């Protein structure tokens, strides 16, 4: 009850401020069972997402009344941690119009998910964007699960923007191509660089990647008025 009240308070505040997208985590009823051994009981996943949707739908309805989108950060440790789980949740909420996505490519690098194709699949749902870098360098000793290593020693670790493996040029291009109108928000976590240097470099990094979207085609100068007779001639009609 307390958690629902806090979510609704945050929604109210967002509505008063005229801010439509609001970030959140989904919570986790199922994540501790994500590895399929021991075998999951039949129906567990379906029931888990049904319950998750049951808890979220009143909040999503309240968000709708305030004109606010709930943007779930697709994040490890949460039941919504990739595209498949987001789709499961969306279906369980009857495709609620206020269920959206906070896109953070760093989490996809660490689970080896195609973060560029993710944009193609979910462009209509992405309403928030974290500019956060990461790298994944597996060894013969550790991989995605990390072996309980400290951050600086993990194969998958977060880095300051520009120091990792995320192709931000392609991300900014895709988001611009699809008409993303939200903020590019610096979320900084790095186990090597200082936060002061990261903040200074990060602001410039984002500025340098912002694309001023063109309002015309580059070859418009060669365009011409429609000439039906010329068209027929070209087609041999």
Question: For each predicted feature, which ranges?
Answer:
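Active-site acidic/histidine proton-transfer and metal-coordination neighborhood
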Residues: 1-100, 232-235
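Histidine-acidic metal/acid-base catalytic patches
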Residues: 20, 57, 65, 82-103, ...
């Amino acid at each position: 009850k307390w958690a629902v009240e806090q979510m609704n308070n945050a929604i109210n505040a967002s509505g008063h401020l005229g801010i439509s997208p609001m970030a959140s985590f989904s919570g986790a009823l199922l994540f501790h069972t994500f590895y399929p051994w021991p075998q999951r009981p039949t129906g567990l996943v379906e029931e888990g997402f049904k319950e998750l949707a049951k808890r979220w739908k009143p909040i999503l309805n309240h968000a709708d009344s305030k004109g606010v989108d709930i943007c779930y950060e697709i994040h490890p440790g949460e039941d919504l941690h990739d595209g498949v789980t987001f789709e499961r949740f969306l279906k369980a909420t009857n495709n609620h119009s206020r269920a959206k996505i906070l896109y953070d490519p760093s989490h996809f690098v660490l689970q080896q998910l195609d973060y560029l194709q993710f944009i193609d699949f979910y462009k209509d749902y992405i309403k928030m964007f974290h500019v956060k870098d990461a790298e994944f360098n597996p060894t013969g000793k550790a991989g995605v699960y990390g072996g309980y290593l400290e951050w600086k020693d993990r194969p998958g670790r977060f880095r300051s923007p520009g120091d990792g493996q995320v192709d931000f040029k392609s991300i900014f291009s895709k988001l611009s191509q699809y008409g993303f109108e939200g903020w590019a928000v610096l979320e900084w976590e790095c186990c090597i660089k200082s936060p002061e240097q990261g903040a200074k470099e990060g602001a410039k990094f984002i500025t340098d990647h912002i694309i001023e979207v063109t309002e015309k085609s580059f070859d418009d100068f060669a365009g011409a008025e429609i000439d039906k007779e010329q068209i027929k001639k070209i087609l041999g009609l």
